[in-house]
Structure formats: structure tokens, C-alpha cells
Amino acid sequence: NDLKVAEKVRGSSGIGLQRYVLAILFNQVIGEANRMLAKVHEGRYHLFRSDDKGKGNKRGLELKVHDNRCPEAQGRSVSMLSGGEKFLVSLALSIGLSTVAQRGGVQIEALFIDEGFGTLDDSSIHDAMDVLESVRRSSGMIGIISHVQLLESNIPTHLEVIKSGEGSRIRLA
């Protein structure tokens, strides 16, 4: 009897219930990430799940990016992105995951981003900060850990860690 239920759940696609549910949630995360990516680099990038028949656990969960500057291209693996592009895609996916989780009832009061901004040019930093500000207004606190000076002028309240011979101290700026 349990075997028949398992076969029904597995279905004709053979992907299994868990992977099926993951794919639905992943599509939602990708959708939210694409909403953010539409606001940076003039909407140049668009994420999508690959239809490639992957190996083992990755099957159906492989992520690719379409570059609108190359409309004839089929999309490329996110592993082929530059450092700055990877940071923006990672940021978009983090925000997308946070949004989907909150929609499901999980309360996320803070989002912390550790570095990554150093890989971006000034225009991309401004784009990312605009997106983060809109997220902050709707979702709560965002903490950014960075050495990029340009961020200091874009963040109204920040903590500065000052190193000295006796140790480090924190200054609210």
C-alpha cells in the first residue's frame, strides 16, 4: 500500500514530491530575484531554471542567466558570471529567498550582507543600494559589512570599527 502511494507521489516525471515542491519554491525565489535584477544594470540579467537533464540531486535545480545584451544566446551558467555579476545575482537570490520565506510566515527581521560591494562599479553600487533601501522600507533592518567608502555616503546610520593599539572600538556615525 505504501509502495502504491510512493509511486503516485513520484508521478510520471520521476522527480519525487520533495524535488517538485522545491522546484515550485525555487521558481518563486527566482521570480523575486528577477524583480530585483530588473532594477539593476538596466534590466540586463534574467535568471531561469535550466531544463537540462542534470545529474542526481541537481536535476531541475540548475540556475542559468540570460543576458539581454545577447538576445540570441541560450543563457549561461551562473558560474560563468564575473565577480560583480555574481554578487548582484547572489544578492537578488538572497532577497528573493527572504521574500518567499516571509510570505510563508517566517519573520525575518534583519538581512546581513558581508562584503561583495568591492566587486561592483559605482553605478552598480548605487543600483544595489536603491534596491536594498526599498527592501529595508518593507522588510526591516539591513546590515552591510564593507570597506567600500562609497557605501558610507549612501547609508545614513552606520557603525565604524576603529582599530587601535589597545584593540578596536566602535563609533556610531
Description of each model-found segment:
Residues 1-173:
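Terminal ABC-like ATPase head and other globular end-domains that cap long coiled-coil arms
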